[in-house]
From Swiss-Prot:
Residues 142-153 have a biased composition (Pro residues). Residues 80-93 are annotated as: Basic motif. Disruption phenotype: Knockout mice are fertile, but have enamel hypoplasia and small teeth. Abnormal ectopic expression of CDH1/E-cadherin in inner enamel epithelium (IEE) cells, but not in cells of the stratum intermedium (SI) at postnatal day 1 (P1). Inhibits the growth of clipped incisors. Significantly reduces mRNA levels of SOX21, AMBN, ENAM, and AMELX in molars at P1. Develops fewer, smaller, incisors at 3 months of age in a transcription factor SP6/Epfn knockout background. This is Achaete-scute homolog 5. Residues 158-168 have a biased composition (Polar residues). Transcription factor. Probably binds E-box motifs 5'-CANNTG-3' in complex with transcription factor TCF3/E12. Negatively modulates transcription of target genes such as CDH1/E-cadherin, perhaps by recruiting the PRC2 repressive complex to regulatory elements. Regulates ameloblast development and tooth germ growth, perhaps acting by positively modulating migration of inner enamel epithelium (IEE) cells. Plays a role in enamel formation. Its main location: nucleus. Interacts with transcription factor TCF3/E12. GO terms for biological process: ameloblast differentiation; amelogenesis; negative regulation of transcription by RNA polymerase II; positive regulation of transcription by RNA polymerase II. Residues 169-181 have a biased composition (Low complexity). Residues 80-132 form the bHLH domain. It comes from Mus musculus (Mouse). The keyword Iron-sulfur does not apply. One of its GO terms (cellular component) is RNA polymerase II transcription regulator complex.
Length: 188
């Protein structure tokens, strides 16, 4: 193919139709299209652009509705779809966060004082559930909890005994002694 020629794309429709073309370099004449392009679908969705951009191309695209550039995301119905999708995602994230907040509210009091990550919250909840299961399995039905267990403490939504290891110590982090915050090694 010769690099010195330039093709012109012309839609040979009615005078009110759209013309698209490439400007030929000075001193060269553009080659006419061998067949009309009226059967080729060409959709234009105007977007936003700077005035210098579309002023430079007003002669090339005389029937294109400028101002505007051609953008991929400028379809007429896409913004509503994106807004609905984003709203659904916001609602989902809000619901998940509320679930974690409720779960934190059911953990013993010492754990609710610190803002826990989602992973820390789940790990602490797992350990607390295991602790409660061990407590229930060690206690016969109808018998009071053993004397070594601390009295029930108010922890938000539940009135479950708080393990003594959750009480804050004066040295170090108040949560360093909590068995519910220790890292859990995955068992294979």
């Amino acid at each position: 193919m010769n690099s010195n020629f330039c093709r012109a794309l012309v839609d040979r429709g009615p005078p009110g139709g759209m013309q698209l073309g490439v400007v030929a370099p000075a001193g060269q004449t553009p080659l006419a299209a061998t067949e009309p392009l009226s059967n080729v679908p060409f959709l234009l969705y105007p977007g936003h652009s700077e005035p210098p951009y579309y002023d430079a191309y007003t002669g090339v695209f005389p029937y294109v509705p400028f101002p505007g550039a051609f953008g991929v995301y400028d379809y007429p119905f896409e913004p509503a779809f994106i807004q609905k999708r984003n709203e659904r995602e916001r609602q989902r994230v809000k619901c998940v966060n509320e679930g974690y907040a409720r779960l934190r509210g059911h953990l013993p009091g010492a754990l609710t004082e610190k803002r826990l990550s989602k992973v820390e919250t789940l790990r602490a909840a797992i350990r607390y559930i295991k602790y409660l299961q061990e407590l229930l399995s060690a206690t016969p039905d109808g018998a009071p909890p053993p004397a070594t267990s601390p009295p029930p403490a108010h922890t938000g939504h539940s009135n479950v005994p708080q393990p003594s290891s959750l009480v804050a110590e004066s040295s170090g982090s108040p949560f360093s002694s909590s068995p519910f915050l220790e890292s859990e090694e995955p068992s294979l």
